[in-house]
C-alpha cells in the first residue's frame, strides 16, 4: 500500500507498506546483486547506514545458488539475514544484455548462462516463479529492455510484447501468492514502462500497463547511454500517465543529481550500483562534491572523507589512511569506501524527505542538484 503524505510541485513525500515494514519515500534501494553488497557489506551494516530497502537480482540468484536453494533456506530474507523490505528485479535487464547469446519469442527468452554456457529459458511465468521462491516484498514484471538507440518499429513491437507479458506476469503472480506454501504470500508486483527514447511509445505503453492493476510502476530502459536531458524528457512525458495512487520507480538511476531531479519529477523509488562501484575505484561523495581519494594530495590529509558524515569510515579514519588502504589494495579500503558512499546516498534521501516535510525541497534542489556530482572545490 502506498500513501502520499505531502507534495511540493510534482515531488512526493510518502510511505509504502509491505510485509517487512513501512518504507519512507522517496527512497534509494541498496543493490545487493547476488544477495550481498559488493565490498564485504553485510545486512547488519545496511541497517547501520540507514538502508530501508535491499535489492537483489533474479537472474544471478537463479543461476547461483539457485532459487530452489533459497526457497529451501526459508527465502532470501532469512538466507542473507535481512529483515527489512526487499525488491527483486525480473532478470530481464541481465538476460537482454546477453545480446549475442539469446533468442526472443512470444513465450520468452532462451539464453546461455554467463557462468557455464548452458541454455536456459525464462519467460513471464518463470520470472514470477523464481521471484516467488526468493520471497521478496516487491517482484518486478518480466520485460524486454531494448538497446538505445533501436529502430522505432522494433521498439514498438517490443512494447506490445512486454504489455502482453505483463498480463501473464499478473496471472502467474496471483496464482503463486495464493499457494499455501508460498514464501511471501504478500509479495507485491510492479509493472515496467518501456519504449526506448520514443516519447509516443513510452506514453502508449504507460497507458496500456496502467490498465493492469499492479502495486506500483517503474520506468525502465533509461540511464543506459542516452543523454541525461533525454532521460529527464522521457520522465516528463511518462509521469503524467502514471497512476497517482501508486509508487513510481526509476530503475538504475543514478547520480545524486539524477535522484534529486527524479524526485522533482514525481519519482519515489531509485536504485543504482553507482555508489558502490565508484567507491571501489576511490570516487567518494561529500556534500561539497566528489573526491578521488587516490589523489596524491590526500596522502597527509588528517580529515575524514566528509566532516559532516557519521558513517563508520568518517567516524574513525582519515582520508590519508583510506588512501593508503586503497593504493595498497587492502580489502578494508573497499569496505569502508562502499559504506561511506551508501551512507551518503541514504542520507541524501533522508534530507530530501526532510525538505519535502518542511516545504523547502525547491531550495534543496537549487543548492545541491549539480553540485553533488561535480569534483569538490574545497581543496
What are the functions of these language-model segments?
Residues 163, 172, 176, 184-305:
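Glycine-rich phosphate/ribose-binding loops and adjacent secondary-structure elements
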Amino acid at each position: 500500500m502506498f500513501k502520499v503524505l505531502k507534495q511540493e510541485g510534482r515531488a512526493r513525500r510518502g510511505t509504502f507498506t509491505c510485509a517487512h515494514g513501512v518504507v519512507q519515500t522517496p527512497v534509494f534501494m541498496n543493490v545487493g546483486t547476488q544477495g550481498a553488497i559488493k565490498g564485504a557489506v553485510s545486512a547488519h551494516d545496511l541497517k547501520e547506514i540507514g538502508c530501508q530497502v535491499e535489492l537483489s537480482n533474479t537472474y544471478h540468484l537463479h543461476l547461483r545458488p539457485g532459487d530452489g536453494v533459497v526457497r529451501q533456506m526459508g527465502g532470501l530474507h532469512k538466507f542473507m539475514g535481512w529483515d527489512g523490505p526487499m525488491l527483486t528485479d525480473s532478470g530481464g535487464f541481465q538476460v537482454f544484455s546477453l545480446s549475442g547469446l539469446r533468442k526472443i519469442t512470444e513465450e520468452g527468452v532462451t539464453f546461455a548462462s554467463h557462468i557455464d554456457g548452458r541454455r536456459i529459458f525464462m519467460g513471464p511465468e518463470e520470472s514470477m516463479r523464481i521471484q516467488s521462491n526468493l520471497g521478496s516484498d516487491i517482484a518486478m514484471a518480466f520485460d524486454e529492455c531494448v538497446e538505445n538507440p533501436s529502430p522505432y518499429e522494433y521498439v514498438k513491437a517490443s512494447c506490445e510484447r512486454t504489455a502482453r507479458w505483463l498480463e501473464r506476469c499478473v496471472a502467474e503472480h496471483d496464482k503463486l501468492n495464493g499457494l499455501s506454501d508460498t514464501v511471501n504470500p504478500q509479495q507485491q508486483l510492479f509493472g515496467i514502462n518501456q519504449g526506448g527514447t520514443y516519447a509516443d511509445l513510452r506514453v502508449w505503453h504507460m497507458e496500456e500497463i496502467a490498465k493492469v492493476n499492479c502495486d506500483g510502476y517503474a520506468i525502465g530502459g533509461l540511464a543506459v547511454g542516452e543523454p541525461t536531458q533525454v532521460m529527464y524528457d522521457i520522465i516528463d512525458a511518462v509521469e503524467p500517465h502514471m497512476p497517482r495512487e501508486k509508487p513510481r520507480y526509476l530503475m538504475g538511476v543514478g547520480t545524486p543529481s539524477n535522484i534529486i531531479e527524479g524526485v522533482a519529477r514525481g519519482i519515489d523509488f531509485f536504485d543504482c550500483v553507482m555508489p558502490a562501484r565508484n567507491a571501489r575505484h576511490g570516487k567518494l561523495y561529500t556534500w561539497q562534491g566528489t573526491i578521488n581519494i587516490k589523489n596524491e594530495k590526500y596522502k597527509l590529509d588528517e580529515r575524514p572523507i566528509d566532516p559532516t558524515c557519521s558513517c563508520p569510515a568518517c567516524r574513525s579514519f582519515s582520508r590519508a589512511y583510506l588512501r593508503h588502504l586503497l593504493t595498497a589494495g587492502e580489502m578494508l579500503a573497499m569496505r569502508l569506501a562502499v559504506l561511506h558512499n551508501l551512507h551518503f546516498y541514504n542520507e541524501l534521501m533522508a534530507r530530501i524527505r526532510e525538505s519535502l516535510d518542511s516545504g523547502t525541497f525547491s531550495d534543496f534542489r537549487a543548492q545541491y542538484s549539480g553540485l553533488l556530482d561535480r569534483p569538490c572545490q574545497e581543496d
